[in-house]
């Protein structure tokens, strides 16, 4: 299954969960899109697990194949499987570019990475799924700071997490791995573990 490129607002409304983490999608119409969107059928255990998996997958904008691969990688790490999975997702380069405030959305952050605008430890990395380690620095190429979309977001200098830092020269740093209570509080990762372990 390829990465979804359609309307994030429709997906958010279908899942009754803001995949952009802003909540804007649900303010106007907090029900699924379409003619029968306001009906909420009773959901099975499998349906709950699937929905939770989709909420997380769409939040990070990943294909099913990538998502599953990351889940399997997390099973080999020390710690609680579900939590390790979330930490791996949160450590992706495109996500940290978003958390640093270099982009308005994860999709925009992924585009910046894919087009070669992002440097890790001073070297160009154009793989959105690149897994960062604490202590690594993340910056934009000098020329890239003049891009209109970048200039717009940098005016606000909005850092979206305590486990990343940004100085006045726009040098970002992945300070440490996040604690579970610091991000995506609405996600129940245990349901996702149950979904894949069926």
From Swiss-Prot:
Assembly, in brief, is: Part of the 30S ribosomal subunit. Contacts protein S5. The interaction surface between S4 and S5 is involved in control of translational fidelity.
Record family assignment: Belongs to the universal ribosomal protein uS4 family.
**GO-annotated biological processes:** ribosomal small subunit biogenesis; translation
Instruction: Note the InterPro entries from the entry.
Output: Ribosomal_uS4 (IPR022801), Ribosomal_uS4_bac-type (IPR005709), Ribosomal_uS4_CS (IPR018079), Ribosomal_uS4_N (IPR001912), S4_RNA-bd (IPR002942), S4_RNA-bd_sf (IPR036986)
Q: Per UniProt, which keywords does this protein have?
A: Ribonucleoprotein, Ribosomal protein, RNA-binding, rRNA-binding
The superkingdom listed in its UniProt entry is Bacteria
Q: Is Cell division there in the keyword field?
A: no
Q: Might you report a single GO cellular component term?
A: small ribosomal subunit
Offer one Pfam family short name for this entry. Ribosomal_S4
Task: State the organism's lineage.
Answer: Bacteria, Bacillati, Mycoplasmatota, Mollicutes, Acholeplasmatales
Name the UniProt record assigns to this protein: Small ribosomal subunit protein uS4
The UniProt record lists the S4 RNA-binding domain at 91-151
């Amino acid at each position: 299954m390829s990465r979804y490129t359609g309307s994030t607002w429709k997906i958010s409304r279908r899942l009754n969960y803001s995949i952009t983490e802003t909540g804007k999608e649900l303010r106007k119409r907090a029900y699924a899109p379409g003619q029968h969107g306001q009906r909420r059928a009773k959901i099975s255990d499998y349906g709950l697990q699937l929905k939770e998996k989709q909420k997380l997958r769409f939040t990070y904008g990943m294909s099913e194949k990538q998502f599953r691969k990351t889940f399997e990688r997390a099973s080999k790490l020390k710690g609680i499987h579900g939590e390790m999975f979330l930490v791996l997702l949160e450590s992706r380069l495109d996500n940290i570019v978003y958390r640093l405030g270099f982009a308005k959305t994860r999709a925009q952050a992924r585009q910046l990475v894919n087009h070669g605008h992002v440097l890790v430890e001073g070297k160009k990395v154009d793989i959105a799924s690149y897994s960062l380690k604490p202590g690594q620095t993340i910056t934009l190429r000098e020329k890239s700071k003049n891009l209109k979309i970048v200039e717009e977001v940098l005016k606000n200098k909005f850092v979206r997490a305590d486990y990343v830092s940004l100085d006045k020269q726009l040098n970002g740093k992945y300070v440490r791995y996040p604690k579970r209570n610091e991000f995506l509080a609405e996600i129940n990762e245990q349901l996702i573990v149950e979904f894949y372990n069926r």
